[in-house]
Amino acid sequence: MLKILIPTIMLFPTTWFMNKKWLWSSITTHSLLISLLSLSWFKWNMDIGWDFSNQYLAIDPLSAPLLILTCWLLPLMILASQNHITPEPLTRQRIYISLLISLQVFLIMAFSATEMILFYIMFEATLIPTLIIITRWGNQTERLNAGTYFLFYTLIGSLPLLIALLFMQNDLNTLSMFIIQYSHLPNPSSWANKFWWTACLIAFLVKMPLYGVHLWLPKAHVEAPIAGSMILAAVLLKLGGYGMMRIIIMLNPITKEMAYPFIILAIWGIVMTSSICLRQTDLKSMIAYSSVSHMGLVAGAILIQTPWSFAGAITLMIAHGLVSSALFCLANTNYERIHSRTLLLARGVQVILPLMATWWLLANLANLALPPSPNLVGELLIISSLFNWSNWTILLTGIGVLITASYSLYMFLMTQRGLTSKHLMNLNPSHTREHLLLTLHVLPVLLLILKPELIWGWTF
């Protein structure tokens, strides 16, 4: 653990004392080396399932893939941000990179925390750098509105969790994940315990986000700069899913009777948000709503608590993290050239940037869960476990899958095919940096086809 955490913290002095000429290249190289070193986390200790760094930090098969995804994303965010941050004053460039590094530190500590209160502190700490990135480096003036939505939705959702954790500490005298899961609640059917159950989960449902409390996400995604969109889609939403998987084991047996409305909302949200995608004119907004749709599947899977659904949830979270981040990078390459996110203004780009069209096709096919992508593995595990739980769910999940395929192909056709507009004839060519960035997104997805058990979690 410390072999990753200490080099990551040492990126701060590197950022502030590095010569301007080598700033971006050195930070990218160092963070890429850290991410390659983090791949050693796949060799967790299978005898006990946990690899302890100390009393408060440990890794298991559930947190290892998410930790590696977090480390993998930092060099990609820095690569993606170079074009639009480089013209700014040097101090602002250093602050921007420092915020991205601090996000990685907080996320590593959140995913490896074994104490619930440490997890909560790190869960909340990720809010500050993300908020600054959105409100300071966003493209339009609506970024302040988006930042306000993001802040208040997340904080109002998280406060009940803090109160619930303090009650738990008072009752059990510990907040260690290892001990809580073996302790039982007195009188699980009481109203107080039902409120406590809701308080424990609502923070994670807002963060995922569940349909109904998702309005902050499209705003935050649309207004955030590219690095903000990438970290939000790839890792911060997964923090909600990870928190749910950790805490829901401790909430039995109340979950069996309390989960029904949330499962219904999650599955209904899959169809609703997929339908919203079909009528979006804004490219980033469409990708943001598709994230809500995929996270609805994950939320439903976690709430029914079967080994298959847990494996499907973690698989889909990792696969979706890489694919949605790649889609945001592609949307950003369009935005940097056309200076508009409107789908209609970017038609026929395939003729001008043919290799970029290949990346669009690969990312969209992975997004619609084409076999044999890990997205399909996750969706099949989730849909089959939901069908086993209730046969009627197949109607909604099936419709959701069909609409997902529709809007993914619609997104590809609208941006790449059709007659090329006159104003697109003088576009800048694509850069090696952009192709490297997209290779580093798509390659892990293709490699995970060969060994998907790396991201199945601890239920197999």
UniProtKB/Swiss-Prot annotation:
The chain crosses the membrane at residues 22-42, 59-79, 94-113, 117-139, 148-168, 195-215, 231-251, 258-278, 286-306, 310-330, 343-362, 394-414, 436-456. Its EC number is 7.1.1.2. GO terms for biological process: ATP synthesis coupled electron transport; electron transport coupled proton transport. Keywords: Electron transport, Membrane, Mitochondrion, NAD, Respiratory chain, Translocase, Transmembrane, Transmembrane helix, Transport, Ubiquinone. InterPro entries: NADH4_N, NADH_Q_OxRdtase_chainM/4, NADH_UbQ_OxRdtase, ND/Mrp_TM. Its main location: mitochondrion. It is found in: Mitochondrion membrane. One of its GO terms (molecular function) is ubiquinone binding. It is a multi-pass membrane protein. It catalyses: a ubiquinone + NADH + 5 H(+)(in) = a ubiquinol + NAD(+) + 4 H(+)(out). GO terms for cellular component: mitochondrial membrane. Core subunit of the mitochondrial membrane respiratory chain NADH dehydrogenase (Complex I) that is believed to belong to the minimal assembly required for catalysis. Complex I functions in the transfer of electrons from NADH to the respiratory chain. The immediate electron acceptor for the enzyme is believed to be ubiquinone. Belongs to the complex I subunit 4 family. PANTHER family: NADH-UBIQUINONE OXIDOREDUCTASE CHAIN 4 (PTHR43507:SF20). This is NADH-ubiquinone oxidoreductase chain 4. It comes from Scyliorhinus canicula (Small-spotted catshark).
